[in-house]
Curated annotation (Swiss-Prot):
Belongs to the TRAFAC class translation factor GTPase superfamily. Classic translation factor GTPase family. EF-Tu/EF-1A subfamily. InterPro entries: EF-Tu_GTP-bd (IPR041709), EF-Tu_GTPase (IPR050055), EFTu-like_2 (IPR004161), EFTU_2 (IPR033720), G_TR_CS (IPR031157), P-loop_NTPase (IPR027417), Small_GTP-bd (IPR005225), T_Tr_GTP-bd_dom (IPR000795). SUPFAM superfamilies: EF-Tu/eEF-1alpha/eIF2-gamma C-terminal domain, P-loop containing nucleoside triphosphate hydrolases, Translation proteins. Keywords: Cytoplasm, Elongation factor, GTP-binding, Hydrolase, Magnesium, Metal-binding, Nucleotide-binding, Protein biosynthesis. This is Elongation factor Tu 2. Residues 81-84 are annotated as: G3. It comes from Serratia proteamaculans (strain 568). The gene is tuf2.
Amino acid sequence: MSKEKFERSKPHVNVGTIGHVDHGKTTLTAAITTVLAKTYGGSARAFDQIDNAPEEKARGITINTSHVEYDTPSRHYAHVDCPGHADYVKNMITGAAQMDGAILVVAATDGPMPQTREHILLGRQVGVPFIIVFMNKCDMVDDEELLELVEMEVRELLSAYDFPGDDLPVVRGSALKALEGEAEWEAKIIELAGYLDSYIPEPERAIDKPFLLPIEDVFSISGRGTVVTGRVERGIVKVGEEVEIVGIKDTVKSTCTGVEMFRKLLDEGRAGENVGVLLRGIKREDIERGQVLAKPGSIKPHTKFDSEVYILSKEEGGRHTPFFKGYRPQFYFRTTDVTGTIELPEGVEMVMPGDNVNMVVTLIHPIAMDDGLRFAIREGGRTVGAGVVAKVIA
């Protein structure tokens, strides 16, 4: 088949497989691409092509991730699969592969296992909004009651972590049999794809969200005022609109009196563009890198939050020694470092390089943040960890 041109017309949705080791995540990924290619067109990806995942760097952390793409009649999917448990943890915490929804793979022969639980918890903490369950290896279980029992266990586990366990879709299938072309099991893959289409809503595009620009630099231009530069993270800013400067200091209002890109004047700056924004009545010394420019009322500054963190191993260039509760590193948000203190969970005395841990962080300056914001943990400019804001506290 010749390479089709990339269809921008279909909504684009990011998904991924999560679940315990050897429950069949990669086999399912291969089965989805194969069955959907056969049914709706597109190209299949073999198991071994998916399993030897290339390394990527996200926030200075090496992660092995496989990306595959597939289509249903109504959508285009980008799907991420990781070979190892540690890769999942890193992937979910760094947000290297943001997921609009996840397929939780549980082997019917085993039921939920420790990593099943851990991936569900991580999904909750990092804000994976929707989970669909694929009960795999159902061809190996003859007892209908056993299947009922496993499904019930999985639903209860999801409910325990605040997912709608009673209502979310559960598909009973066999990835291997589907991959081998057995029609009754291929039908289960089509059923799963149907749930991807119907259960995961179309994600809101960055351009439709409220305006936010992390400030990278500040200049004053004589006779014109103060210009801040940076890449618009989301939304649109139009000339004449009110904006807020949020973080580090008290929040200040201003008006955008001009937008420039490559020395040209524009009417607006949009998500993804590197722009300069001219601000009315603001002095150069009133603004600094690390603040954000945002739609008024859309984001607030905070100093205290609950987070999920991955600490780099020595081999990844991280610390060589554990840290304890008095640890005071820098937390790097968007464009700047802010010092913070940490509280570890009860019973956790120290954190080893290579661990992932839940911690409450208190920053010495407020930073504009929402749940789901990613950050790096640094010591003297060197990245030693990555984290995500699970919940803002104050």
